[in-house]
Amino acid sequence: MNDMSSDGKKVKSLSDLPGVGQSILNKLIEAGYSSLEAVAVASPQDLSVAAGIPLTTAQRIIKEAREALDIRFKTALEVKKERINTKKITTGSQALDGLLGGGIETRTMTELFGEFGSGKTQLCHQLSVNVQLPLEKGGLGGKAVYIDTEGTFRWERIEAMSKAIGLEPDSAMNNIYYMRAINSDHQMAIVDDLQELISKDPAIKLVIVDSVTSHFRAEFPGRENLAVRQQKLNKHLHQLVRLAEMYDLAVIITNQVMARPDMFYGDPTVAVGGHTLYHVPGIRVQLKKSRGNKRIARIVDAPHLPEGEVVFAITEEGVRDAEE
């Protein structure tokens, strides 16, 4: 990684970039660009307008930030080595981990979609606890951010799940940043602000949005609003993907399903969000109810994983393998 500036100085923050004095630094921070990562993925035009700096200055700063973060063309072999070293978070079920190729991946957005009661929120609660486990136990020794759009977060479940895996409940809850999003604009603003939070607390290794589509559906109903809704949703999803890639963390989004009256065979339900949500997440997992506490998980789309399905269980202690 080339984290040296052109004058040989090691680059750790925006203030280390050549030509970024206190005046420009203040403008960048006030405009919401408080980290190297935020600047590196910005467009020169957006940065120039937002921070009130010349376009040529914005282009130079972005170039320096990208060099510091080693954002460049890579060979397929380098990509292979990165993929092999991808970190994963255990779900609590060996069967479900196996379906996912070892667990929930970092640097990737995973979508969990299914009907009410299919286990989406339970799995999100479990992952926000499991990410805190040490590496040797299937965690990342990290913290979680939980963005709740439907008011379904329950501290009681966090307490029960953390006790079950040997974590002190209050400490586990202290490692989960929680925010209730009241509308779609608030939801997007929270994700915008996450760059600053993650820069201050690099221990954050998991971001959850449960659910990603509910506010967008409620605020933009009908076909006449579809284009605006999809445009906003697409921007929001790409915000989350950038976070996953920039900070090497896992992103989980949940999504609802709706009935398709034109389906006469197979599964008559389809995930909400249309083509926007079909293409952005790296891994798409459908969850379904089964008998009792059992749930079915099925890989719907993942470029590196075979299609398949497994049964797991939701118990008082959390997500576990289903008993035969």
From Swiss-Prot:
Q: Which molecular-function annotations from GO does this UniProt entry contain?
A: ATP binding; ATP hydrolysis activity; ATP-dependent DNA damage sensor activity; damaged DNA binding
Mind telling me which InterPro entries this protein's record contains?
Answer: AAA+_ATPase (IPR003593), DNA_recomb/repair_Rad51_C (IPR013632), DNA_recomb/repair_RadA (IPR011938), DNA_recomb/repair_RecA-like (IPR016467), DNA_repair_Rad51/TF_NusA_a-hlx (IPR010995), P-loop_NTPase (IPR027417), RecA_ATP-bd (IPR020588), RecA_monomer-monomer_interface (IPR020587)
UniProt keyword list: ATP-binding, DNA damage, DNA recombination, DNA-binding, Nucleotide-binding
Q: Which positions form S-S bridges?
A: none
Q: Where is the signal peptide?
A: none
Q: Which Pfam families match?
A: HHH_5 (PF14520), Rad51 (PF08423)
Is ATP-binding one of the keywords UniProt gives this record? yes
Query: Which residues are ATP-binding?
Result: G114, E115, F116, G117, S118, G119, K120, T121
The keyword Chaperone is annotated on this UniProt entry: no
Could you state one GO biological process linked to this protein? Answer: DNA recombination
What family does this chain come from, according to its entry? Belongs to the eukaryotic RecA-like protein family.
PANTHER family, per database record: MEIOTIC RECOMBINATION PROTEIN DMC1_LIM15 HOMOLOG (PTHR22942:SF30), RECA/RAD51/RADA DNA STRAND-PAIRING FAMILY MEMBER (PTHR22942)
Q: According to its UniProt entry, what is the function of this protein?
A: Involved in DNA repair and in homologous recombination. Binds and assemble on single-stranded DNA to form a nucleoprotein filament. Hydrolyzes ATP in a ssDNA-dependent manner and promotes DNA strand exchange between homologous DNA molecules.
What is the name listed in the Swiss-Prot or TrEMBL entry for this protein? DNA repair and recombination protein RadA
Q: What gene codes for this chain?
A: radA
